Structure formats: C-alpha cells, structure tokens
Amino acid sequence: MAQRDGRVAVDIHTDGACSGNPGPGGWGAVLRYGEHERELHGGEPARTTNNRMELTAAIMALEALTRPSVVRLHTDSTYLRSGITTWIAGWRRNGWLTKDRTPVRNADLWQRLEAAVARHEVEWLWVRGHAGDPGNERADALAARGLQEARQTPPPA
C-alpha cells in the first residue's frame, strides 16, 4: 500500500448526477489505495441539485477513509473544486454569506466537506467529464446507479 509520512495515499474519483436539477439525484465515488479499490454510491429521491450531489460524493468518499490520508481527489465539477480551494475561506470569514451578503447555497454540505477535509491532506484535481478518464467514467456510472435507485425510492413524506 502506497504511503507518505506514514499516511495512506488514496486516489478518489467523484461524480454527481441529477434529473431535472432540481430533481432526484445520485452520487458516486471510486477510492483507490494500493491494490485496493472501493466503490460508493447513493442517491436522493427528493428534490436535489447536481451541485449537492457533487458535494455529497466528495463528502462520502472522504468520510469513508478510516484514518488520515494523503488524497488526490479527481472531480469534473469546477463548482466543487473552486468552492473548496478558493471560495470557502471567504464564506467562513463572512459567516457563510457570499460577497453579496446572501446565504451561501449548500452551506450545510460545504461545512460538512470542510470537516471531512480537515483530517486529510487533499489535492483537488479537475478532470474533463465524459472525456474517457477511467476513474471519472466509473464515478459517473456509479452516480447514474445512485440516481436510478433514488428514482425507485419514494421521497420522504
């Protein structure tokens, strides 16, 4: 198993999907460490957005790691990558308000993601979606599976 400074090196590929935006959604993640691979997916039958599903994929993948790790997280979402690497510090400083003083969308998930990231050393890598990257294609297929399962689940009453 690859390690750095005693920490496991993990490659994560994430993706989110949504039908209707808002509508039912799904997320998927592929975690690779050494010779091991783990796939995660899930969905939301109620009204959600593609951005919420992208965030959820990253959160679930990072929360699945059982110990602090060195992570390379690959995403096709510029919203996710820019949010966590650039915008989040300002949002936190402004009390989770945008520069226009409006509430940050998905603040609940951004805060959860920030907590999940704190345990790890994470490098955020953007990949072009639907361009043949094997990890992204697999994460996309898992997100589609999560969406399909969410469509078959009745929304909460």
Curated annotation (Swiss-Prot):
Alphabetized GO MF terms: magnesium ion binding; nucleic acid binding; RNA-DNA hybrid ribonuclease activity
Give the GO biological process terms. Answer: DNA replication, removal of RNA primer
Q: Name one Pfam family in it.
A: RNase_H
Where is the protein situated, by its record's location annotation?
Answer: Cytoplasm
State its cofactor.
Answer: Mg(2+)
**Entry keyword set:** Cytoplasm, Endonuclease, Hydrolase, Magnesium, Metal-binding, Nuclease
Q: Residue ranges of the RNase H type-1 domain?
A: 6-148
Q: Tell me its EC number(s), please.
A: 3.1.26.4
Q: Which domain of life is it from?
A: Bacteria
InterPro entries linked:
RNase_H, RNaseH-like_sf, RNaseH_domain, RNaseH_sf, RNaseHI
Any binding details for the cofactor?
Binds 1 Mg(2+) ion per subunit. May bind a second metal ion at a regulatory site, or after substrate binding.
Of the GO CC terms on this record, one is: cytoplasm
**Sequence positions that bind Mg(2+) 2:** 15, 140
User: Which segments carry the region annotation Disordered?
Assistant: 136-157
Q: Where does Mg(2+) 1 bind?
A: 15, 54, 76
Q: Could you tell me what reaction this enzyme catalyses?
A: Endonucleolytic cleavage to 5'-phosphomonoester
Protein family: Belongs to the RNase H family.
Q: What is annotated about its quaternary structure and interactions?
A: Monomer.
This chain belongs to which protein, by name?
Ribonuclease H
Originating organism: Frankia alni (strain DSM 45986 / CECT 9034 / ACN14a)
